[in-house]
Amino acid sequence: MQYFAVNAMIGKGAYAVPDFPDASSLLGHLDYLGIDRAIVYAVEARDASPYLGNQALLEAIAPFAERLLPAFVITPSNTFETGVIDWLRSQAAAGHRVFRLCPEVCRFPVRQIERVVAELTEFEPVLLYDSRFSGTESSFRDLEDLATRYPSIRVVICQQMWGGFTQVLDLMWRCRNVYLDTSWLHMRDTIELVRDHFGIDRLLFGIGYKSHYGAAIGALAQARISAADRELIAHGNLERLLQLAPPPAKLAPEHPLLAQKPLWKRFKDGHPLENVTIYDAHGHNGPHARGWVLATPDTPEILDILVQRMDQYGVEKLFVSDGKALFGDIVVENRRAERLAERHPGRFHGYFVYNPLYADDV
């Protein structure tokens, strides 16, 4: 299957040791994972100068133009810089229609980007919003305003994890031109939930940090969706937004190390792992009302679903802490969780939830 990632980055910046200091290092990572193409932005454009960093990006990825496509960082200052808006418009006219918003790092509220976006709307731009786990409430209100005022734009929420996830779902409900990438969706059954409520076309494939390696690929491979829907998320939806045809064949070569990694090959093909004992050391059960969004609210049913997922992935045991014990009566709820786990002998081991407010109860 082909993969087209929406949120890669290259370059050295002020705030972290880079995963990918240059285009070649990113391409090596994409090859290792079997990812054919990626939208990439320059850290220099985010941390220092958008205009100079965007120009340097084009030069850096030019030798790999078949596989690396640019995303240009934009900021409100572009409006006041001589020639920058004209340059952005010329790039959009040439087909480079992806732009990235990094308001927290670039120090501006989202609403201030409107003058720049207004200059680009005729090109149906794709705006990548850098959420980094959880964007602010004001940012999401500003994104709603932009998406409503300019229906020709496409807003993609990137790197969104469970924190504040309800505001993403709310924004997708309010605005049909808002999309979500899969890079940080480290929550159970989220791909299926978004599909059921908003349609499979609203999901785009993305990768996280280098340390994530194939997490997003594995999540997509194991999602309970059709093969056709999997292809749409992996590359088809982004190709449609950018009006690009898929390559006639995979661009990522088969990495020689994969021959030594039969477990990974089996998992990314959608099968459970075999001939290896796996204990998952960090899980939760019980109802959730603190940012998590799950279709099943009842604890006994959640345990049944967890066992189904464990069997699907090849996990033998799961170590869990109980949600109700975390936020309620530690004695009653820890005991209740233990009784519920007995319905699946040997599959669950519990972390005893302790709250010093109730030390005398233990």
Q: Can you describe what each PLM-predicted range is?
A:
Residues 1-10, 19-37, 200-202, 212-277, ...:
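Mid-to-C-terminal alpha-helical segments outside catalytic/metal-binding sites
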Residues 3-8, 38-40, 69-74, 97-101, ...:
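Hydrophobic faces of well-ordered beta-strands that scaffold small-molecule active sites
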Residues 7, 30, 57, 61, ...:
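Conserved, mostly hydrophobic/aromatic
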Residues 10-21, 284-300:
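Acidic/histidine-rich helix-loop elements
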Residues 11-14, 45-49, 76-80, 107-108, ...:
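Active-site environment of divalent metal-dependent phosphoester hydrolases
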Residues 14-18, 138-144, 165-172, 190-197, ...:
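Histidine/acidic-residue-rich catalytic or RNA/ligand-binding cores of hydrolases
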Residues 36-37, 45, 52-128, 134, ...:
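Active-site gating/metal-coordination segments in enzymes
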Residues 98, 105-204, 255-257, 264, ...:
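Catalytic pocket-lining loop regions of alpha/beta-barrel enzymes
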